[in-house]
Amino acid sequence: MDYNNASPWQGREKHHRAAIDAALKAGVKHIVYTSLAFANPSKAGVMTAHIRTEKHLKDLEKEGKVSITIIREGLYNESWPLYFGYYFGLKEETRKEVLVAGDGRVSWTSIPDMAFATAKILSAREGEWIGKTFYLSQKKTWSLEDIARLVSKAKDNEIKLKVVGRKEYEDFYVTEKGMERPSVEWWSSSYDALKDGECAIDDPTLETILKEAGRKPKSLDDTIMEMLR
């Protein structure tokens, strides 16, 4: 993993490069890479492997070895518990207060919407998306404070959001919740990215593709209600 500041090509991107090298060896001429909807550069550790992979692909493109398309997939609606203080117990959670290390607006996007748009891109006429880097995120945004409100509504019980510093966040989830420190420290950097607005995406690509198919993006409100039903 990327924990403990893995050196280049020793983190998750090691596997990305192996797949890319195998594709080139097999004679593949075009690679579509599904990246993640943080910025580049980013403060989020989770984005490091993607940034390294994106750079490698762009270098290969410049060398004329392959053409590329980079899709920065939006942060999943369905992943909100990870950002909301590891709220994986969902209906069984008893916490009245959830600690996070920062807040910011996020263009949460459902997996089915992204899957549909990605499939349309993959099946598009040859050359339509070559050389492009873009996001697949809906334009509406929600904060973690909004999520606290939605969870409270779904559970008919007030759940408060408490924003603390990264050190307090890390110590709490390691000491009180028994999580592994390298993992928590790695993940806590994501909140710096949220605070900087990295995940508030203004890219019309997803909504344009959905609109052409007579669809609208699924709301985070609906996803939370379904997951807590």
Model-found features: residue ranges?
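Oxidoreductase cofactor-interface core, primarily capturing Rossmann-like NAD(P)-dependent enzymes
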Residues: Y3-G11, A26, A37-K160, E176
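Aromatic/hydrophobic pocket-lining residues that form the small-molecule binding cavity
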Residues: R12, H16, I201
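Terminal hydrophobic/aromatic helix or amphipathic segment near a protein terminus
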Residues: F134, A148-E198
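Amphipathic terminal alpha-helices
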Residues: E207-R229
